[in-house]
Swiss-Prot record:
Part of the 50S ribosomal subunit. Contacts protein L20. InterPro entries: bL21-like, bL21-like_sf, Ribosomal_bL21, Ribosomal_bL21_CS. The gene is rplU. This is Large ribosomal subunit protein bL21. This protein binds to 23S rRNA in the presence of protein L20. One of its GO terms (molecular function) is structural constituent of ribosome. PROSITE patterns: RIBOSOMAL_L21 (PS01169). It comes from Fusobacterium nucleatum subsp. nucleatum (strain ATCC 25586 / DSM 15643 / BCRC 10681 / CIP 101130 / JCM 8532 / KCTC 2640 / LMG 13131 / VPI 4355). GO terms for biological process: translation. The keyword Nucleotidyltransferase does not apply.
């Protein structure tokens, strides 16, 4: 059984046991979170349930494994022949989760 979920403005295809990095969730490590924005559920009874836009009563339960920061991305802008430049760095926050169950 698999599902397509939406979290942090992105969509992910998940199955039970998957470990993935999603945009930061406000949850403590080793807690469970229910993701209710389920767009599609398939498998199990060989039926595909497509939401309009969400599947009614479906949710995905995930366990928070860790919180962290991604790799540093450098943004450097400059103007040729001028003494003008700007350097900025950014590290995106993420949450690593493990899918424990898909409830449809």
């Amino acid at each position: 059984m698999y599902a397509v979920i939406k979290t942090g403005g992105k969509q992910y295809k998940v199955t039970e046991g998957d470990v993935l990095k999603v945009e930061k969730l406000n949850a403590e490590v080793n807690t469970t979170v229910e993701l209710t924005e389920v767009l599609l559920v398939a498998g199990g009874d060989n039926a595909v349930k497509v939401g309009k836009p969400l599947v009614e009563g479906a949710k995905v339960v995930v366990e928070v494994l860790s919180q962290g920061k991604g790799p540093k991305v450098i943004n450097f802008k400059y103007k040729p022949k001028k003494a003008s430049h700007r350097k900025r760095g950014h590290r995106q926050l993420f949450t690593e989760v493990k899918v424990t169950s898909i409830i449809a």
